[in-house]
Amino acid sequence: MALFVISINHKTAPVAIREKVAFGPEKLADALERLRCRPDIDEVTILSTCNRTELYCATPGEPDEISLIEWLGQYHQVSLTELKACCNIYNDEDAAQHMMRVASGIDSMVLGEPQILGQMKEAHASGRAAGSLGGPLDRLFQHAFAVAKRVRTETAIGENPVSVAYAAVSMASHIFSNMEQNTALLIGAGETIELVARHLYRAGVRSLIVANRTLSRARDLAAEFHGSAIGLSDIPEYLHRADIVIASTASPLPILGKGAVEKALKRRKHKPMFMVDIAVPRDIEEEVSELADVYLYTVDDLRQVIEDNMKSREGAAEEAERLIAAGAADFMYHLRALDSVSVLRRFRDQAEGVRDAELQKAIRLLNRGDDPESVLRMLAHGLTNKLIHHPTVQVRRASAEGRQEVTGWLRDLFQLPDEKVNND
């Protein structure tokens, strides 16, 4: 059995690649079913966020990572050359350590951000629901969650984290000196957009429009900040009002196109618009950036804002890395120990079989009236001979073949004392 992870993330691939290999909710169940049916995979699940797509796998034998990368390319119609250039592969203990780093927020663009742990738990739940988890990989997820909890409680990694939402609003504040006079249009109503709304409100924005596919959710979020709610189809009608547009949905296709933005700019008399597209795949067409009066940024453009704020938590990150390394080593120690369980069970069954056979023989002799002491001596002699016969034969054969290490294993296994050297 082997564990491995295939990772495409914000460090290895730009958003243009990441959006191609993203698994939306409509694709995830189908992808897991296809992977689950592969004979070279025992367990599998997928994590897909705006910053990463990762395949977590357990295989019955040596893993064939390239075959899985080929599958990923075929599924998303991306060339193998393009994918191989931006994939990181982690095996066994490195895979365990990587999963714990991801769950703890250490591998995130935003160091220590808490959202990733929830996303990892969703990936775990998806695998369980698909029937593609239930063994060592399942236990690794549980262990990773426990380590992530320790990192959160025993280090300062999560104190005042700078989120992608915060970074987006921070960039807007550099462009608009007085946010109270601005109107913000938020596309989506998930956790990230909710954080954006909170940061905008704290920054002084009081005119907020929330657009979402589910209008009731948009109304609930808008009500918290005294804003208004619209459906996605209403965006063209309201777009010209927005000075700030921040988008983060799970849509597989762009929601806001160049044509709609051009019309909005005309109605605004070309007053500039600031846009941040946090979504992967992107919600705003890339061509919108060609318009002279639009400042369009993607999640990758927020990196510098985030990195500037990460330096204060570098010490906490080092402490977290130590906890993660220890957690990964501990998991692999127990996982390797499990590999011996079936062998030890067969060994015990064999020994108990020898014991029962010799015991029955002794009972028959006692019932026949034989001397009890002689019967006990025969029982002890029979047990000793039967139990050590096969190991003795195998050790002698190994020594004759030059495999002296077997003798050392026997010494360690039975804690045999070193031979005394007679110097007389």
From Swiss-Prot:
Provide the reaction this enzyme catalyses: (S)-4-amino-5-oxopentanoate + tRNA(Glu) + NADP(+) = L-glutamyl-tRNA(Glu) + NADPH + H(+)
Q: Any keyword Transferase?
A: no
Which CDD domains is this protein grouped with? NAD_bind_Glutamyl_tRNA_reduct (cd05213)
Which family, according to UniProt?
Belongs to the glutamyl-tRNA reductase family.
Quaternary structure per UniProt? Homodimer.
What this protein is reported to do is described as: Catalyzes the NADPH-dependent reduction of glutamyl-tRNA(Glu) to glutamate 1-semialdehyde (GSA).
What is the official name of this protein in its record?
Glutamyl-tRNA reductase
Recorded source organism is Hahella chejuensis (strain KCTC 2396)
